[in-house]
Every structure is written in C-alpha cells, then in structure tokens.
C-alpha cells in the first residue's frame, strides 16, 4: 500500500519541476534590450526558459542583467541578447525588478557565447549557466 501511494506523489513532484529546453524546440522571442551586437556589447548570450507542467509553468519570468530587464519569458521561450565583457549579475524573478527571484553571478569573456537556463525546480526559481 505504501508503494502504491508513492506513485502519485512522485508523479506530482515530477510535474512541478521544469524540463530542460533545447534551442530546436524553443519559441524565439525578441529581447527587450540589447538586441544587436555593438563594439561595446559583442558577446551573444542565449537565455532559455525551461518548461514545467504545473507549478510555475504559466507565470512570466523576467530576466535581468546587472539590474536591467532583458526579457520576459513564458514557458518554452528563448531570447538572445548582446552583453559587454566582464562580470554580470543575472537574475530571474516574477517581478520586473527581480527582487523575488534568484541571482547567478557570471563572467562573460570575448569569444564565448554563454547559454543560460531559467525555470522552476519544484521549490524555487533557478538560473543556471550551461556553457
């Protein structure tokens, strides 16, 4: 009986977490800022919103880079923006100022193309650099 009870619990917890998104399955949206490369901002940064079935799935997530809103993404969406080399405080949250979310500190270097994934792990928001 205990094992039978575990099946729906595991199913619910699995549905609450996000599933990793790949670029070929993503819906591309334009960034709200820094949409084109410039000599000051040559680094192409891709942000993908992983998708979840229940918890956090319908909410819009706001992506900020050093306090500046870059994009607002729904489930299965991705955006690409251009950033300057150096240290960046990347945050994801439900509010447009990002105070209710998570922060990832990362250094962007010339010649690299960082890829970030944001989503919901069943308990909290996350923002992870994948490359």
Stretches found by the model and what they are:
Residues 16-131:
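Short loop/turn and low-complexity linker motifs enriched in small/turn-promoting residues
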């Amino acid at each position: 009986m205990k094992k039978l009870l575990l099946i729906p619990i595991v199913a619910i917890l699995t549905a609450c977490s996000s599933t990793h998104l790949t670029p070929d399955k993503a819906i591309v949206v334009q960034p709200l800022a820094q949409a084109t490369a410039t000599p000051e901002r040559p680094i192409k940064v891709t942000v993908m919103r992983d998708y979840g079935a229940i918890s956090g799935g319908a909410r819009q997530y706001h992506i900020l880079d050093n306090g500046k809103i870059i994009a607002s993404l729904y489930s299965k969406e991705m955006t690409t923006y251009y950033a300057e080399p150096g240290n960046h405080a990347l945050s994801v949250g439900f509010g447009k100022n990002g105070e209710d979310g998570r922060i990832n500190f990362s250094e962007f270097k010339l010649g690299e193309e960082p890829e970030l994934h944001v989503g919901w792990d069943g308990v909290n928001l996350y923002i992870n650099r994948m490359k």
